[in-house]
Amino acid sequence: MKLQAVMETLLQRQQRARQELEARQQLPPDPPAAPPGRARAAPDEDREPESARMQRAQMAALAAMRAAAAGLGHPASPGGSEDGPPGSEEEDAAREGTPGSPGRGREGPGEEHFEDMASDEDMKPKWEEEEMEEDLGEDEEEEEEDYEDEEEEEDEEGLGPPGPASLGTTALFPRKAQPPQAFRGDGVPRVLGGQERPGPGPAHPGGAAHVAPQLQPPDHGDWTYEEQFKQLYELDGDPKRKEFLDDLFSFMQKRGTPVNRIPIMAKQVLDLFMLYVLVTEKGGLVEVINKKLWREITKGLNLPTSITSAAFTLRTQYMKYLYPYECEKRGLSNPNELQAAIDSNRREGRRQSFGGSLFAYSPGGAHGMLSSPKLPVSSLGLAASTNGSSITPAPKIKKEEDSAIPITVPGRLPVSLAGHPVVAAQAAAVQAAAAQAAVAAQAAALEQLREKLESAEPPEKKMALVADEQQRLMQRALQQNFLAMAAQLPMSIRINSQASESRQDSAVNLTGTNGSNSISMSVEINGIMYTGVLFAQPPAPTPTSAPNKGGGGGGGSSSNAGGRGGNTGTSGGQAGPAGLSTPSTSTSNNSLP
C-alpha cells in the first residue's frame, strides 16, 4: 500500500539523515560563494540570502540539523544550492537520478542550510497535499486515524512556520521512536508537534468545545435524585411547600410506597405541591375527572398547552404520588368512586349513542328513578282523602334490543283503605313493609350496579344485566306485597305477570267480598291504562273527590274507556244526603276525564 511505502521511506531517510548528521558534525562548514551556473536551483533560494548567510555563519551545527530535516521534508528537490561546493554538482545529479534515493540527505552544509530556510515553507504544503491525496484511497478503518491526524496537522500548521530555535535533537529523535505517527505529513510539523503540543495547549481547540456542552445537563431528566428533590423544594418561596413535601414524603414512606423519583413532565420537574393544591381546590381527583378540568390544571402548572396527553399524564402521576395522600388528609373521594369516574370517562363517547333514556347510575340521585313524566300520579285517580296512596312507576329501561322493561315501584299502597276501619292498622303495617322491601330492593340493585361497573364487562352488557336484575327484584317485591295484603284483607287478588319480552301489560284486579261496602278495582299499569273504582265514603265529605255523577243517593258507575269491559257497582243509600260516592275515573294515554 502507498501509506506503508511512504512510512518505510521516511524511516529510511531518518536513519540516513542521522548517520550523515553524525559524520558532518565533525567537519567545519565552508561558506564558498555560489557559482552563477546554478540557475536551476529552487526559485525560493533568493528569498532570504542575507539572513541565511548570517545564520549559517553563526550556527553551523544547527544548520546541519536543519539540512537533515529538510531532506525529509522534500525528497524530490529539483536542484542543488548556491552554497554547495563545485564538486558536489555531479553527486547531486547522481542522487536525483537514483530511484529510491532519500533525496538531499548528502548535500553540503551550506546547501543544507539554504534548503532548510528556502524550501521548508514551500515544499511542506506540497508534501501534505500528496499525503492527503494518498489518504483518500485508504480503507475506512484507516480514515478515522487519518482524520484525527489531519486535525492535529491543521492545529500544528496554525502555530506558524518553524523558527530557528524550534528544531533540535530532542525534537527529531523522539519522533523517530513513534513511526505510526511519523507517516502523516513531513517531519517538520511532526517535530513541532512533539515540542509544542503540550506547551500552548490547543492541540484540539474544537474538542474542548464539543465536550463542554456534554457535561452540562441537557434537560431535567438527567438530573440525579437529589437534584430533582432540590428543584422541587426550590420552585418557589411558598413556606407551605416544604411543609407539604415533608409531610407527603413521610406519609408515602410510612405507607410502604416511598417516592423514589420525582416525575418529569415537559422536561421539567412536575410541581407536586401545586398539582395537589389545584386538584383539591377543584374538589378532588374524582371531580376533576368528571368535570374534565385538566386544561385548567395544566394552565395552573404553567405547562405548555401543546402536550397531547397532558390529562392522562397528570391523572396517572396524581394517582401514583398524591391520591393516597388526598384520601388520607382530605377524604374527598374513595378508590371505588375514582374507578367509576375513570370508567365513566372512558364510556362517555359510546354512551351517547344509546340515547337520553339509558339508565345511568348516580349515588346521590337514586330517588330520581322513582318519577316518570309519562305517567303522572294525578292521572291515575287513586288519591284518597286520608293518605293519598298511589302507584309510582319508574322509567323504562332501554336494553340493547330496544325492548321496554316496565318496573313498578309501589311507594304506598295502591288503594285507599280509609273506608275500612277494621283493616286500617293492618294496611299501615303492609304499607310499611312494602316501603321497606322497595328500599331494600333498590339498595341491592344499586350495590350490584356498583359491582358491575367495577368489573371489566362491556357497558352494553352491564346495562342489560342491571336492568334485568332490578326488574326481577322489583317484581318479586311487588308480588310479596300484594300477597301479604291478600292475607289480611277480605279480597281476592289476581296478579298477572308476563315476561318483559312479550310486551304484554301486567294487570292487578281486586274484587271485594264485603257486601254493601264492596270494592271493585282494575289497574293496568303499562300500555293503555285505565282504572275503575266505586266504593262508599264515610259521612264526612272530601273536596278532593270528583263531582257526583249520580243523584242524592250517591251512586256512580265505571266503564272501561279502552273498550275492554268495565266493572260496575252501586252503593246503597246509607250515606243519605251527606254521603258522597267517588265516581270511577277512566284514564288512558289518549283521553282524560
UniProtKB/Swiss-Prot annotation:
Record's protein name: AT-rich interactive domain-containing protein 3A
MF terms (GO), sorted A to Z: chromatin binding; DNA binding; identical protein binding; transcription coregulator activity
Entry annotated with the keyword DNA-binding: yes
Key words of the record: Cytoplasm, DNA-binding, Isopeptide bond, Nucleus, Phosphoprotein, Transcription, Transcription regulation, Ubl conjugation
Modified residues (Phosphoserine): S77, S81, S88, S101, S119, S353, S362
Region (Homodimerization): 490-513
Region Acidic, residue ranges: 119-156
Top-rank lineage group of the source organism: Eukaryota
Subcellular location(s) per record: Nucleus; Cytoplasm
Biased composition (Gly residues): 549-576
Residue ranges, compositional bias (Low complexity): 54-87, 580-593
One term under GO cellular component: nucleus
Region (Disordered): 14-222, 497-516, 539-593
Domain ARID: from-to ranges: 238-330
Ranges for region Important for nuclear localization: 445-488
Record's subunit section: Homodimer. Heterodimer with ARID3B. Interacts with E2F1. Interacts with GTF2I and BTK.
Biased composition (Acidic residues): 128-158
One Pfam family here: ARID
PANTHER family per UniProt: AT-RICH INTERACTIVE DOMAIN-CONTAINING PROTEIN 3A (PTHR15348:SF1), AT-RICH INTERACTIVE DOMAIN-CONTAINING PROTEIN ARID DOMAIN- CONTAINING PROTEIN DEAD RINGER PROTEIN B-CELL REGULATOR OF IGH TRANSCRIPTION BRIGHT (PTHR15348)
A GO BP entry: positive regulation of transcription by RNA polymerase II
UniProt note on tissues of expression: Widely expressed, with highest expression in skeletal muscle, thalamus, and colon.
SMART domains hit by this protein: ARID, BRIGHT
